């Protein structure tokens, strides 16, 4: 049986690649794509989701825009990483279809209610939409199988020394999600910083002769530029968001640990930090499966093999 999923994202180069990876597989039944502000402004992330689905010929998947700002803060965007459009690099088609008139939360709620099997939510941006869904529709919690999210880290930040971008943008939303009691898998920087795509990997992808692979190669050519800054110490570019889909497809590529995760919402230097209790020091019951390591070569193989399916 295919797993029903909803992708909640803020495209974003790595969000776009996560969508492409997910839709290459018959393991999933994609119910909806919803968007939030984050990597770019809400109008641009919504448009980018429509552009990617148009490229993939998947206008059958309903799309809805969500929260335009965090629950209690002003919006921060990552245009320094993703460019003016949010998907700088490739030439993408204009959307061939329109978003739904309803909001992201309304669309998610409708699809979860209608689903015969529990739904997996895959948020790869700030957690505002997911928090609003859980708060306004407690009756639907029982039909949510799990939340597999990209965000956080066990001890390193990429937006502040303590905080990863997605959680930092809306820590109050993240706090609500981690306290909701729904099974969570956290794909944080500990694992995503190992999921680097190198120049030779981009060449391998470009050698796959279909338009989707060419688009991904173009996305990566732009995305890697930001990560060449020596301060990061990267050889390539970390593909954060596709790790969520890779975990669902091939969990054997990862190492993971059950742990309690708390969200810091008030710290002077640590707002947005995910406090991961690896050693059980708090005595709190584990509320997440936290990913720590990845087989990078296996991850790149999965990505390349998935892109090859678009040639058929």
Curated annotation (Swiss-Prot):
It comes from the Bacteria. One of its GO terms (molecular function) is uridine nucleosidase activity. GO terms for cellular component: cytosol. Its EC number is 3.2.-.-. The active site is at 240. It holds the Pfam family IU_nuc_hydro. PROSITE patterns: IUNH (PS01247). The keyword Metal-binding does not apply. One of its GO terms (biological process) is nucleobase-containing small molecule interconversion. Gene3D superfamilies: Ribonucleoside hydrolase-like. Keywords: Glycosidase, Hydrolase. Signal peptide: none annotated. Hydrolyzes cytidine or uridine to ribose and cytosine or uracil, respectively. PANTHER family: INOSINE-URIDINE PREFERRING NUCLEOSIDE HYDROLASE (PTHR12304), URIDINE NUCLEOSIDASE (PTHR12304:SF4). Belongs to the IUNH family. RihA subfamily. This is Pyrimidine-specific ribonucleoside hydrolase RihA. It comes from Shewanella woodyi (strain ATCC 51908 / MS32).
